């Protein structure tokens, strides 16, 4: 338990990824390149969807918001991580730590819910194609987006309240490259029981509800696709879901490994690698996953390139 005269620290010290001096600059260059690619690809996809009329559909509205959350939560984490490679004293203010954690939970919860909404969108498109234009109107899409951001805000508020209940009397050294809840639990001088319960219940509610919606949607999608006689029809139906399934597997697999465990099972060194994957690598991979075999995105990119550079591409104008 915390002592009665315990005061809140004004700063935390982030241990970073490694304390090996010889690795600081190489890692800085690697993650700077990854962050640059992340911003260019996600912001590029946002821009492409905004300007191309062919992509003004519910599926791409959701994808545009997914790119926004990827770019945003990578920006919440990566710049500070890059700074730790260059700074001798790797500090972050107490307020900065709280804000970083709040923003991180807000954006990752938004992504979690977006993946569920995107699964529902694919379910309606494949299982109820005739009703799709009436069900998934632009107004409905934006109401869904607004609702999921609001729910993500509430989840972030609960998590942050759990963090604010903690005291740090004996140590302010966070064994991580950003202010995540598990290393802060490790250095708390007060009981973490209530805070841990809040985080696990709130996090489980959103993660599991997202997974359940995704699973139910894909059960109905598979049952519908099996009934399609045409091989081309089956391929087209499944091809629209492949990218989403890859993104879901990467995101939810890592989140479940990271957070839906009791604190006593945490291994901070292992968690650093897992955290690195979903805070830095996944935001870079998502736009590539969704664009890799997507003919509509490729055609839109050709049209934008043709318009920007003033040349005519026969494929672009089709």
From Swiss-Prot:
It is found in: Cell membrane. Residues 1-26, 80-100, 165-205, 261-271 are extracellular. One of its GO terms (molecular function) is odorant binding. Disulfide bonds join 97-179. The chain crosses the membrane at residues 27-49, 58-79, 101-120, 140-164, 206-226, 240-260, 272-292. It is a multi-pass membrane protein. Glycans are attached at residue 5. One of its GO terms (cellular component) is plasma membrane. Keywords: Cell membrane, Disulfide bond, G-protein coupled receptor, Glycoprotein, Membrane, Olfaction, Receptor, Sensory transduction, Transducer, Transmembrane, Transmembrane helix. Residues 50-57, 121-139, 227-239, 293-318 are cytoplasmic. It holds the Pfam family 7tm_4. InterPro entries: GPCR_Rhodpsn, GPCR_Rhodpsn_7TM, Olfact_rcpt. The keyword Electron transport does not apply. It comes from the Eukaryota. Odorant receptor. Belongs to the G-protein coupled receptor 1 family. This is Olfactory receptor-like protein COR3. It comes from Gallus gallus (Chicken). The lineage of its organism: Eukaryota, Metazoa, Chordata, Craniata, Vertebrata. The gene is COR3.
